[in-house]
Regions:
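Surface-exposed loop/turn segments flanking beta-strands in extracellular/periplasmic regions
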Residues: 273-310, 407-447, 499-530, 560, ...
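Surface-exposed, low-complexity/disordered Ser/Thr/Gly/Pro/Asn-rich loops and linkers
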Residues: 451-454
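Residues on the lipid-exposed face of transmembrane beta-strands in outer-membrane beta-barrel proteins
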Residues: 185, 242, 254, 330-336, ...
């Protein structure tokens, strides 16, 4: 078989060293160990890789098994590799079955075509293409690889799965922990992210898709692969294909997983005693008087007065040691020779790490999502297929109300002084006082507490998304063999409700030392209920496409062609909500391959 595709490679020689240590114990005496360095004799092995017809295979990989020592064949199918005689070599090339051989001089390796690999197809823009005929830079991953780890967002498991793809996770907040994806870096068109398509239709994000619904994900990386998308594909394209039913008996699958989420590492904070000593040393170094008296430092040291002179580790006080995450999915697939179906329902929950205390509303970050999907294919006639894709999700997230977000809460927690507050005592939020107590002791300052989110209210967001696709595929072999026509229509909508509880207040207290040595509290402010408000938002878009596809083989020659028209409009509740925006496109593609 004549193959003219080749890749320039680099031989990576690796020297192998073995150290043998011999120990000879006898009657309680042990001789000194002797280290002997043995260098295996290596030589340059020359060989040729050909196909079953004796034609040289250009660019075949030759790798010494168990090492990174490898090379590729040149334009004549010849390779040279530095290994020892008798070493095992693995020879491989796309479209052929891998072969393991023993290294010897002037060897000849015959690779046999892998019919399965030659017929394997890859998802590409607006269609599929045989892997063996592809020239663009495309990487893919199967759906089963995505479900090995329980994650809420598909983007969090893609990192390391495909070359050229980088993911960065900026937050661990439940419901907002999706990783940002970069394909071969990042282009600069409006600071855009990669284009995401699910079953051929643009989607805003992949973070709300259940991984159990996915058949495969393909990443289009270079210009030749993304050209048909124009400027929209400047940062790469992610093509997600969902599962579909196949003819046969119904298959029921149920998966469930539970995980324990814990902070990976928390910064250890100084105790009140250490804080006071270090602060006094700092003041002394600057030629100033110490602020913390010996009496206060002694109180910090012995912990005898934890309300007036507290020592609190804010990370331990306001954060839980762990929380739970769970993921469940039930799906059924099957069909007859006329109708095929895939039906899926999934649920995902992720708890928060912030303590909720005793308020009537939730103060912790939490996220819950329910996914559903139905993919239905019906053969209306022998040449006509009608398909329906109905999917969506309902998700809810809870957050404590703060102007600084979750990162601000963490920052305040670490900035808080360990003696600023003893926390909540008998249902009261107690703050330390910098007034002089009746025994003459006084805190020079109190600093901020880590309880900034306590009593500030909450925010609950609920989002309901619906996606409906209708596809009609008509074979037109009556005109010419290999010709087909497809029309697709899609409607997508989302509705968001944001419930906010704000405007309430929490009374705070400071300790007072009574004459009898007991502790009383001075009250500041009053407890008032939060006021509730609701805001809603909606977005919708529609998409349509019509295309002619041609795929035909003439002997050793295969020709494919695509001509497609598509149009999309998006409506958002912005300032100019009556003015939609969208695009209209014409796409053409022709491919040819020989053998």
């Amino acid at each position: 078989m004549n193959k003219k595709n080749f890749i320039k490679g680099t031989t990576l020689p690796v020297a192998l060293f073995f150290t043998i240590a011999t120990f000879a114990p006898a009657w309680g005496l042990q001789t000194a160990s002797a280290a002997i360095e043995v260098v295996q004799q290596q030589s340059t092995i020359k060989g040729t890789v050909v196909d079953s017809q004796g034609e040289p295979i250009i660019g075949a990989s030759v790798l010494a098994e168990g090492t990174s020592n490898g090379t590729i064949t040149d334009i004549d199918g010849v390779f040279r590799i530095n290994v020892r005689l008798g070493a095992k070599l693995k020879v491989s090339f796309i479209g052929y079955t891998d072969k393991k051989v023993v290294a010897k001089n002037d060897m000849k390796v015959i690779l046999v075509e892998d019919v399965t690999a030659l017929e394997e197809v890859e998802i590409v823009a607006y269609g599929t293409q045989k892997k063996v005929t592809m020239t663009g830079a495309i990487a893919s991953v199967k759906g089963e690889e995505l479900t090995r780890v329980s994650v809420g967002s598909v983007s969090n498991v893609l990192g390391g799965q495909m070359t050229g793809l980088t993911t960065v996770q900026y937050s661990g907040e439940p419901g907002a922990d999706a990783a940002e994806i970069f394909i071969r870096g990042k282009a600069t068109w409006e600071n855009s992210s990669p284009l995401i398509q699910v079953d051929g239709v643009d989607r805003e994000s992949m973070s709300d898709i259940d991984p159990n619904e996915i058949e495969s994900i393909s990443i289009l990386k270079d210009a030749s692969a993304t050209a048909v998308f124009g400027i929209r594909g400047a940062n790469g394209v992610i093509l997600i294909t969902t599962k579909r039913g196949k003819e046969g008996k119904a298959k029921i699958s149920f998966t469930t997983s539970a995980s324990v989420l814990m902070p990976t590492k928390m910064v250890e904070q100084a105790s009140s005693y250490d804080y006071a000593r270090f602060h006094n040393q700092m003041m002394s170094g600057d030629g100033k008087s110490a602020l913390f008296s010996d009496g206060v430092i002694q109180k910090f040291a012995d912990g005898s007065d934890p309300i007036r002179f507290p020592n609190i580790q804010w990370a331990d006080y306001i954060m839980k040691s762990s929380t739970l995450q769970s993921q469940h999915n039930l799906n059924i697939s099957g069909g007859t020779d006329k109708v095929r179906y895939f039906i899926s329902a999934g649920a995902y929950t992720q708890g928060g790490l912030f303590s909720e205390f005793d308020l009537p509303y939730n103060l912790s970050y939490q996220y819950r999502r329910f996914n559903y999907r139905t993919n239905l294919d019906m053969d209306v006639t022998k040449t006509t297929t009608l398909s329906f894709n109905i999917s969506g999700n309902v998700n809810n997230s809870d957050q404590p109300r703060t102007s600084q977000g979750s990162s601000g809460l963490i920052k305040n927690m670490y900035y808080a002084t360990p003696f600023s507050s003893p926390g909540i005592i008998d249902g009261k939020l107690v703050n330390s006082s910098d007034e002089t107590y009746s025994d003459g002791l006084k805190l020079p300052f109190t600093g901020g507490t880590g309880m900034g989110y306590y009593g500030n209210g909450f925010s609950q967001t609920s989002n309901n998304s619906l996606n409906v696709d209708v596809i009609l595929d008509q074979k037109m072999d009556f005109l010419t063999k290999g010709l087909s026509f497809k029309v697709k229509g899609s409607y997508n909508s989302s509705f968001t409700v944001n419930k906010v509880g704000s405007g309430g207040s929490i009374a705070t207290y400071t300790p007072v030392l009574m004459d009898d040595g007991s502790i009383a509290y001075r009250k500041f402010g009053e407890n008032t209920d939060v006021k509730y408000s609701y805001t809603t938002g909606k977005a919708r878009n529609w998409y349509m496409e019509a295309s002619f596809n041609y795929n035909r083989t003439f002997g050793d020659h295969t020709v494919t062609a695509l001509f497609l028209y598509n149009q999309q409009k998006e409506y958002y509740p912005k300032v100019y909500s009556d003015i939609p925006h969208g695009y209209v496109g014409l796409v053409g593609r022709v491919t040819y391959d020989w053998k």
